[in-house]
UniProtKB/Swiss-Prot annotation:
One of its GO terms (biological process) is molybdate ion transport. It holds the Pfam family SBP_bac_11. Gene3D superfamilies: Periplasmic binding protein-like II (3.40.190.10). This is Uncharacterized protein HI_1469. GO terms for molecular function: molybdate ion binding. InterPro entries: ModA/WtpA. One of its GO terms (cellular component) is outer membrane-bounded periplasmic space.
Length: 115
């Protein structure tokens, strides 16, 4: 079976797995995915590791590869957005979300479950 090698930022790993399964069923081509920090994957490509596709949420990584002539072409296919919210509780209503972000007393997790 033919294969495509993909270096992907860890944040895209779960979506890549789902897309890989569908792609394999339709095209009968295996996706070999290597997921991790995009900066480290970029360094591996710069050092000679070969892949067919590189996925990074940080356009700087892609630009570095383009500048060093390590990639043939680049394409932005999506943009991230960050949404911030708070619970509808009285003690959150007296500060803006940005104030809460920098107030360490509000940034804590009391109950963390094991995976």
């Amino acid at each position: 079976m033919e294969s495509i090698t993909v270096f992907s930022a860890g944040s895209f790993c779960y979506a890549l797995q789902e897309l890989s399964d569908i792609f394999r069923q339709i095209h009968h081509i295996e996706i070999k995915a290597f997921c991790g920090p995009a900066g480290i994957l970029r360094q591996q490509i710069e050092q000679g590791n070969r892949g067919d596709i590189f996925i990074s949420a940080n356009p700087g990584n892609v630009l570095q590869l383009a500048d060093s002539k390590k990639i043939y072409q680049k394409l932005t296919i999506a943009f991230n957005q960050l949404a911030l919210t708070t619970l509808n509780l009285e003690h959150f209503r007296h500060k803006s979300i940005f104030e809460l972000l920098f107030d360490r007393s509000f940034l804590g997790v009391k109950n963390v479950s094991k995976y």
